[in-house]
Swiss-Prot record:
Disruption outcome: Cells lacking this gene show an unusual large LL-diaminopimelic acid (LL-DAP) pool and an important variations of the LL-DAP/meso-DAP ratio incorporated in the peptidoglycan.
Gene this chain is encoded by: dapF
Active site: 73, 217
Quaternary context: Homodimer.
Key words, A-Z: Amino-acid biosynthesis, Cytoplasm, Isomerase, Lysine biosynthesis
Protein name: Diaminopimelate epimerase
Record family assignment: Belongs to the diaminopimelate epimerase family.
Pathway info: Amino-acid biosynthesis; L-lysine biosynthesis via DAP pathway; DL-2,6-diaminopimelate from LL-2,6-diaminopimelate: step 1/1
Function description: Involved in the succinylase branch of the L-lysine biosynthesis and in the biosynthesis of the pentapeptide incorporated in the peptidoglycan moiety. Catalyzes the stereoinversion of LL-2,6-diaminopimelate (L,L-DAP) to meso-diaminopimelate (meso-DAP).
Activity modulation comment: Inhibited by 2-(4-amino-4-carboxybutyl)aziri-dine-2-carboxylate (aziDAP) and iodoacetamide.
Source species of the chain: Escherichia coli (strain K12)
Subcellular location: Cytoplasm
Amino acid sequence: MQFSKMHGLGNDFMVVDAVTQNVFFSPELIRRLADRHLGVGFDQLLVVEPPYDPELDFHYRIFNADGSEVAQCGNGARCFARFVRLKGLTNKRDIRVSTANGRMVLTVTDDDLVRVNMGEPNFEPSAVPFRANKAEKTYIMRAAEQTILCGVVSMGNPHCVIQVDDVDTAAVETLGPVLESHERFPERANIGFMQVVKREHIRLRVYERGAGETQACGSGACAAVAVGIQQGLLAEEVRVELPGGRLDIAWKGPGHPLYMTGPAVHVYDGFIHL
């Protein structure tokens, strides 16, 4: 099986063309391939499939390193767009794809960045899903013997965003896994730790569902900005500084889609016998 290794700000992927190859991935195989000592090593596996709708170009599937399939990965979407162009699967700059829960448009810019229409953030608890009696801008949660204030949003996948004074000292390794599996998130959640530098700039670390802390999380950056704007903390255009680098997020508020712009890097091509 041929594959490519790619990354978006250090969030790394194994990308496989299932348009011209016949492939099947069991959870066990994915876990083996994801092992950084015994396999290829990656945060997520991205699979390019033929479209199910003639109006679309491709179907986009995402698997976490633990073998679970998820519906959204922003950094992966940028790598997906670069991959299908690099491999000659399309020469379009505007690439329309379906995912497990919707559709996306990926745009390759003139300076080789990728701009992704991530859709409109959904703050309804049932959409996340998150157990709450009604939608709030801020929720109070109990975890690890602490009282935590957070915002909750779906970017096609579930996110919880906590504001911290300093991301460098935030309890990502200890609080992240506790909140990821909290009973109020029946499908688990990605946990973002956000430091507001100013209205146009945040620093962010994300403990990803099924992957742990990564160098960058695109949908996590979108979620943090969406929550920050909803809570009145941020402007409509925000620079997000992650351990792996920078993303630019723009959202005009309810009724509008949110846009993420950032890089996607091809590292190498490989072949593996399964």
